[in-house]
């Protein structure tokens, strides 16, 4: 099957969140399963710099008028992969050649022409489905998140016109980000007037790229079974729950997985010493990773102090006010906190102040550093993910893989991947972390105290850590589920 993945970012070339990890790992898993998978990316500077052997494929006209842009093709080499990924890149410097964040300007405001920048991404996908590259035409286009949300819309109308028979799949990675644009921007999109309707892209008088993907795609997926159920409720549906209930029959929740070539404590080059736990032993490397990390971050070098880590965007969604509110308990119990992330200015400042007040117990690094992220998981004891909502979450999966036990709220993909340390689940060998239910300080505080209590029982801690590290989370299983969804999309498209 010829499958085109359409994404705004891809690890290791460009990453602002978990979308990039999926976009980098899923094509490789599909290729390993015998599928012909390629990717389509916008020509951001980091992407152009990372794609090798770029060569012109074709030129095409923008949906908004006479402007023409180039499509180039090349290879993305991924460490440990059996073969490179074939990548199409949209060559449009006027839209994509901007420094820093790919979506926002220096003042953290979305670029005013984002509707054009990402309409072009979906438009190029639809052009490929109509033969833009004479040598390769996708049978299925898989569009990821709002940035690629117009691809299914363009394909729908191209099929109506008899220009293609390509099927479409749309994946929601985070429903909170919907690609909302002013109604007058619809004229730039090159879609027929009926598309700007409640049964289409129209959302409270505005244009929603997310809604376009949800309405027009042949099949829908999201990144965990629990999140697939949650987004059909008013509480988690962000105003789109009615549409999602209507399309619930074509919606599938497929858990993200961990790329073992990138996230593997036994082979991770970012760690001072590797470690693994096939039988609960061979863990000396983790103790050394913790000691080196404490020294590197200026924390007190205490092996007995449980080290809590937080690798996250600093936003309200991530439950960081719970972490701030519980920090006194964490420190009073003898713990340490190491944070890596960036986001809302108020949260950044609040964490900086706590680090300044207790520099030997709290480390805060604002920004993102992939190497440091690996080192935090390698040296950490507990990974904090107390989210208000979490579509899937990769952070807790990295924590599981590296034996940094996740402390999470029972929501979305967190509920699907972490088993609480209840007496029953510890006895059965299923427990892998600490789970709380209510999004409040009291419930979070109880989970914190349970983590400290287990840490004091070293044999039990080692058993739970072993459970966590052995938890299967492979892309081969996820790829098989996606392939079945692609088959369903082809059937819906009539091919």
Curated annotation (Swiss-Prot):
Q: Kindly list the biological process annotations in GO that this record carries.
A: glycogen biosynthetic process
Enzyme class label: transferase
Q: What positions does the entry give for ADP-alpha-D-glucose binding? A: 15
Record flagged with keyword Transferase: yes
Q: Which InterPro entries match?
A: Glyco_trans_1, GS/SS, Starch_synth_cat_dom
Which GO-annotated molecular functions does the record name? alpha-1,4-glucan glucosyltransferase (ADP-glucose donor) activity; alpha-1,4-glucan glucosyltransferase (UDP-glucose donor) activity
> Which pathway does it serve?
Glycan biosynthesis; glycogen biosynthesis
Give the intrachain disulfide bonds: none
Q: Which reaction does it catalyse?
A: [(1->4)-alpha-D-glucosyl](n) + ADP-alpha-D-glucose = [(1->4)-alpha-D-glucosyl](n+1) + ADP + H(+)
Which keywords label this protein? Glycogen biosynthesis, Glycosyltransferase, Transferase
Q: This protein's superkingdom? A: Bacteria
What is the E.C. number?
Answer: 2.4.1.21
> Which Pfam families does this UniProt record tie to the protein?
Glyco_transf_5, Glycos_transf_1
Which GO terms of the cellular component aspect does the record hold?
cytosol
Family of the protein in this entry: Belongs to the glycosyltransferase 1 family. Bacterial/plant glycogen synthase subfamily.
* PANTHER family, alphabetized: ALPHA AMYLASE DOMAIN-CONTAINING PROTEIN, GRANULE-BOUND STARCH SYNTHASE 1, CHLOROPLASTIC/AMYLOPLASTIC
What the protein does? Synthesizes alpha-1,4-glucan chains using ADP-glucose.
Q: Which HAMAP family match?
A: Glycogen_synth (MF_00484)
Q: What is this protein called?
A: Glycogen synthase
What organism is the protein native to?
Variovorax paradoxus (strain S110)
């Amino acid at each position: 099957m010829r499958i085109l993945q359409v994404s705004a970012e891809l690890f290791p070339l460009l990453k602002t969140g978990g979308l990039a990890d999926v976009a980098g790992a899923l094509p490789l898993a599909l290729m390993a399963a015998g599928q012909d998978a390629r990717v389509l990316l916008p020509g951001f500077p980091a992407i152009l710099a990372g794609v090798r052997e770029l060569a012109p494929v074709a030129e095409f006209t923008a949906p908004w008028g006479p402007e023409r842009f180039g499509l180039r093709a090349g290879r993305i080499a991924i460490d440990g992969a059996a073969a490179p990924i074939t990548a199409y890149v949209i060559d449009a410097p006027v839209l994509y050649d901007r420094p820093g964040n790919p979506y926002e300007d220096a003042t953290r405001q979305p670029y005013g022409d984002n509707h054009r920048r990402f309409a072009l991404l979906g438009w190029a996908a639809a052009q490929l489905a109509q033969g833009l590259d004479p040598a390769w035409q996708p049978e299925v286009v898989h569009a990821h998140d709002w940035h690629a949300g117009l691809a299914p819309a363009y394909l729908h109308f191209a099929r109506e016109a008899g220009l293609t028979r390509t099927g479409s799949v749309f994946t929601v990675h985070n429903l909170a980000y919907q690609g909302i644009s002013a109604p007058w921007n619809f004229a730039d999109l090159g879609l027929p007037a009926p598309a700007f309707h409640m049964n289409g892209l129209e959302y409270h008088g505005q244009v929603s790229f997310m809604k376009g993907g949800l309405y027009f795609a042949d099949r829908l997926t999201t990144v965990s079974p629990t999140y697939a159920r949650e987004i059909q409720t008013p509480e988690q549906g962000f105003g789109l729950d009615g549409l999602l209930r209507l399309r619930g029959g074509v919606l599938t929740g497929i858990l993200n997985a961990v790329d073992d070539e990138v996230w593997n404590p036994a082979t991770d080059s970012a760690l001072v010493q590797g470690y693994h736990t096939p039988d609960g032993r061979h863990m000396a490397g983790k103790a050394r990773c913790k000691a080196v990390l404490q020294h590197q971050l200026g924390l007190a070098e205490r092996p007995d102090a449980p080290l809590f880590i937080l690798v996250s965007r600093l936003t309200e969604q991530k439950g960081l006010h719970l972490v701030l509110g519980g920090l006194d308990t964490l420190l009073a119990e003898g713990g340490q906190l190491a944070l890596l992330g960036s986001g809302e200015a108020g949260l950044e400042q609040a964490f900086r102040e706590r680090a300044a007040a207790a520099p030997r117990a709290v480390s805060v690094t604002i920004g993102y550093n992939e190497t440091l992220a690996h080192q935090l998981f390698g040296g950490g004891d507990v990974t904090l993910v107390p989210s208000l909502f979490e579509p899937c979450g990769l952070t807790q999966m990295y924590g599981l893989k590296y034996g940094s036990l996740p402390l999470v709220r029972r929501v979305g993909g967190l509920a699907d991947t972490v088993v609480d340390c209840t007496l029953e689940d510890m006895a059965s060998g299923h427990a892998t972390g600490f789970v709380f239910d209510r999004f409040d300080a009291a419930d979070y505080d109880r989970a914190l105290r349970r983590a400290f209590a287990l840490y004091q029982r070293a044999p039990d801690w080692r058993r739970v850590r072993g459970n966590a590290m052995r938890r299967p989370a492979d892309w081969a299983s996820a790829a098989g589920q996606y392939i079945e969804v692609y088959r369903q999309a082809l059937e819906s498209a009539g091919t």
